[in-house]
C-alpha cells in the first residue's frame, strides 16, 4: 500500500489517527441519537461499505484517509449500537459470545486478505471484495432492521433515559461523575492492557526473554486464542454465577499473569503469564458493558454510558500500546511486564471503587426464541 502511494511507512500512522478519532466521535454521538439499533447498524454497515469502496479506488494517501474516516464513523456507530443493545437485552453468555465473534473476525480477516494477496490480487481488489461483502451485510441489516425491536421493558428503559417521569427519583438518577469517570477509565485501561500485551508480546518474549522467534510467534497467537476461548467458555460461567463474580476474579487474574511475566525464571514462565493474562482479560469488557446499569445506578443513561465506554476503549487500545512502545524504546523490552502489572493493579483499584458505588438493578432482558 505504501509503495503504491509512494509514502514512507510512518505516513500510514496518519490513517490510524484519523480512523480512531472518527470512531470515537461516532461512538459518542451514537449514544445521543434517538434511533433504534436496527437502523443504526444498517446505516453504519453501509457506511463502512462505502468507505472500503473509496479505499479500494484510492489513488493517494489522502483519499485513503477520507475512506478511513468514513470507516471509523461507520464502525463507531455499529460498535456503540451493538454494545448498547447487548447491555439492554443480553445475558452474560450472549454478550461474551458477541465479543468472541469480534475476535474471530479480527483473526480470520487478515488471513483472508493475505490469501488474496498471495493469490496475485492487488490490495485494491482485496479492499473491493471486502466492500462487496459489507454491502451485502448492509442489505441484510436493512431488510431485517425491524427484527431489532425493543421489548416493552427495554422500551420503558430507553424512554426513561430521555424522559424521566415526574416524581420518579430512580428515573431522574444519573451516575455520579466520579463513578462515570471510573467506568470510562477502567474501560480504557483494560482494553489498553489487552492491545498492549498482544502488540508487544512478541518483542517482549524474543528480545526481553530470549525465546526463539517461532516460539514467541506461537505464544502471541495463543494469547489471542485465549482471548477468544475465554469469552466462549467464561460467558456461560458468568451466566450461571452472575456477571459480577467473573470480573472480580478476572481483575485479579490480569495482574497475576503480568506478575508471572515479570518474575525472573525461564521463558516458559513468561509465556504462561501471558496466557493467564489473556484468559483473565477475555470476559472483562463484555461484562463491564453488561453491568453498566449497575454502574449507572439504574436504567437511566445506559445507552449513553455504553457509547462513552466504547469510545474510551478505542482511545485506550491505541494510546496505551503507543505509550508502552515508547517505554520499550526508552528502557528495554523487559519493561513491558512490570508496566502491565502496574496497569493491572490500577485497573483492579478502579474496579473496586466502581463496584462499591454501583447499585444492583434488574438483569437485562434476554430474548427467547
Q: Which residues make up each language-model segment?
A:
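Helix-to-loop junctions at the C-terminal end of transmembrane segments
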Residues: 24-38, 230-243, 328-329
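Intracellular juxtamembrane helix-capping segments at the cytosolic ends
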Residues: 76-90, 282-298
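C-terminal transmembrane helical hairpin of 12-TM major facilitator-type secondary transporters
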Residues: 241-288
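Cytoplasmic helix-loop-helix junction between adjacent transmembrane helices
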Residues: 67-102
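A late C-terminal transmembrane helix in Major Facilitator Superfamily
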Residues: 298-333, 340
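Conserved MFS/SLC helix-loop-helix module at the cytosolic interface between two early adjacent transmembrane helices
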Residues: 24-62
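Helix-loop-helix hairpin linking two adjacent transmembrane segments in secondary transporters
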Residues: 98-149
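Extracytoplasmic gate region of multi-pass secondary transporters
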Residues: 176-229
Amino acid at each position: 500500500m505504501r509503495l503504491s502511494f509512494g509514502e514512507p511507512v510512518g505516513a500510514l500512522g496518519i490513517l490510524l489517527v484519523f480512523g480512531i478519532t472518527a470512531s470515537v466521535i461516532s461512538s459518542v454521538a451514537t449514544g445521543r441519537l434517538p434511533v433504534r439499533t436496527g437502523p443504526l447498524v444498517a446505516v453504519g454497515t453501509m457506511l463502512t461499505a462505502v468507505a472500503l469502496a473509496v479505499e479500494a479506488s484510492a489513488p493517494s494517501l489522502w483519499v485513503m484517509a477520507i475512506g478511513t474516516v468514513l470507516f471509523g464513523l461507520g464502525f463507531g456507530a455499529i460498535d456503540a449500537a451493538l454494545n448498547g443493545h447487548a447491555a439492554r437485552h443480553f445475558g452474560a453468555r450472549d454478550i461474551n459470545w458477541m465479543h468472541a465473534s469480534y475476535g474471530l473476525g479480527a483473526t480470520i480477516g487478515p488471513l483472508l486478505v493475505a490469501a488474496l494477496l498471495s493469490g496475485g490480487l492487488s490490495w485494491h481488489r482485496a479492499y473491493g471484495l471486502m466492500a462487496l461483502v459489507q454491502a451485502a451485510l448492509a442489505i441484510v441489516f436493512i431488510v431485517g432492521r425491524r427484527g431489532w425491536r425493543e421489548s416493552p421493558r427495554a422500551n420503558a428503559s430507553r424512554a426513561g433515559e430521555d424522559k424521566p417521569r415526574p416524581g420518579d427519583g430512580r428515573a431522574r438518577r444519573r451516575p455520579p461523575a466520579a463513578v462515570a469517570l471510573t467506568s470510562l477509565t477502567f474501560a480504557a485501561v483494560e482494553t489498553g492492557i489487552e492491545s498492549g500485551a498482544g502488540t508487544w508480546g512478541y518483542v517482549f518474549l524474543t528480545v526481553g526473554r530470549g525465546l526463539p522467534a517461532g516460539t514467541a510467534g506461537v505464544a502471541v497467537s495463543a494469547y489471542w486464542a485465549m482471548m477468544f476461548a475465554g469469552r466462549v467458555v467464561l460467558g456461560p460461567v458468568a451466566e450461571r454465577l452472575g456477571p459480577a463474580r467473573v470480573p472480580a476474579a478476572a481483575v485479579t487474574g490480569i495482574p497475576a499473569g503480568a506478575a508471572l511475566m515479570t518474575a525472573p525464571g525461564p521463558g516458559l514462565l513468561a509465556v504462561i503469564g501471558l496466557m493467564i493474562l489473556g484468559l483473565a482479560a477475555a470476559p472483562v469488557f463484555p461484562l463491564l458493558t453488561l453491568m453498566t446499569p449497575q454502574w449507572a445506578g439504574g436504567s437511566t443513561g445506559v445507552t449513553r454510558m455504553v457509547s462513552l465506554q466504547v469510545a474510551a476503549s478505542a482511545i485506550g487500545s491505541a494510546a496505551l500500546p503507543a505509550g508502552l512502545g515508547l517505554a520499550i524504546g526508552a528502557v528495554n523490552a523487559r519493561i513491558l511486564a512490570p508496566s502491565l502489572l502496574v496497569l493491572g493493579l490500577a485497573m483492579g483499584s478502579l474496579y473496586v471503587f466502581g463496584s462499591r458505588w454501583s447499585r444492583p438493578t434488574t438483569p437485562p432482558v434476554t430474548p427467547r426464541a
